[in-house]
Amino acid sequence: MSQKIGHSGLAFARLWHHVDVARDKRTLGRLASAIAITLIGRHKPVYHPSQDCGDYVVVTNCQKIRVTGKKFEQKTYWSHSGRPGQLKLQTMNKVVADKGFGEILKKAVSGMLPKNKLRKQRLDRLKVFDGSENPYKQNITAFAHEQSSIPEPLKESIFNQLK
C-alpha cells in the first residue's frame, strides 16, 4: 500500500472566481446557487462540512441580473427587530434603489448558504459590483465559463511549502 499523502495544499488553496452576469444567461436563483456552491467549497475534492475550504467569488455587472415575472415589483424582503410593530417590508425595486443590484444577489446567496458559524466568513468572500470594474482583477484565476485551473506561480509556491 502506498504511503504517499498527496498534495492537499493545492486542494485547500483558495482561488478567485469571476462571474460576469452580463455574459451569464442564468436567472438570479440559479446563479446564486452556483455561487453558493463555490463559496462553500463543494466543488473541491477535499470538501467537508466542518471545514471552510471555499473560494472567493467576484461578481461584476450585477445591474444586468435576470429575474423572471414581476419580481422587481412584487418580491418583498422583510426584516424584524423583534419589537412589536417593527416589521419592515421592502420591494426589490426599493432595495435596488437604496443599495444597488449587488445587494439582491448577496441576499439570494445568503439564503442558499448553510445557517451556521461559517456563513459570515463565506459571505465575506463574495465581492459584488454593479459595473464591470473591480479592484480584484489581478487576483482572479478562474472564470465561470471556463474550467478552473491553478496558475503556475501558485502551484510552485504550494509545492515549495510542502517540501
Curated annotation (Swiss-Prot):
Transmembrane ranges, per UniProt, are none
Example GO biological process:
negative regulation of translation
- Pfam families, sorted: Ribosomal_L13
Taxonomically, which superkingdom?
Eukaryota
Protein localization: Mitochondrion
Record carries keyword Heme: no
Keywords noted in UniProt: Acetylation, Mitochondrion, Ribonucleoprotein, Ribosomal protein
Signal sequence, renumbered to the chain: none
> Could you give one GO CC term from the UniProt record?
ribosome
Another remark in the UniProt entry says: Present with 6700 molecules/cell in log phase SD medium.
Q: This protein is called what?
A: Large ribosomal subunit protein uL13m
Q: Which gene encodes it?
A: MRPL23
